[in-house]
Amino acid sequence: KMFERNYFGMMMVETGDADAFITGLYTRYSNTIKVAKEVIGIQPGFNHFGTMHILNSKKGTYFLADTLINRHPDTETLIDIAKLADKTVRFFNHTPVISMLSYSNFGADTSGSPVKVHGAVSYMQKEYPELAIDGEMQVNFAMNRELRDAKYPFTRLKGKDVNTLIFPNLSSANAGYKLLQAMDPDTEFIGPIQMGLNKPIHFTDFESSV
């Protein structure tokens, strides 16, 4: 299997014969993700990795995750995604203000996927009290500070404009960023940006311009 392009390319990165590996255009993501975990490995302190898209719009810069890797994340996976997003946003010299999204607001639905998101938020707030993160919440409350502050004045995000959106699963993340892309083709999207692997392995799709 070493002659398969993903294994060969990633082994070159792992052994120092290449600085980075770009993949995904002609291979299945599921296979590429498996090889990346096996050959490159995940950064210490994490059990999962993910990807982020950056949206540069007239309204500002937004960071969206996870847009490619984790199909049905559980609470532990969402925690890792949130931690990786925080780290990545800071790398780009922004202060993360994180909303963890759902169709439910702050425990209103006590079943299904909102419970996973709520659990991730509770953990993050307990372990990282200095971090501006809250949820679970609907995207309209995440994006509208005045509406959010009026309806939910108790949030840790009071008075803050959200710039980082963590989606509850891959379906919502993929649909969300591609909907924004389709509605305004002039808006600049950067990504997917890999978060959490030990070395630079980057994924592309058919819409990639570079």
Name the predicted role of every residue range.
Residues K1-V210:
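Anion-binding alpha/beta catalytic cores of soluble intermediary-metabolism enzymes, centered on
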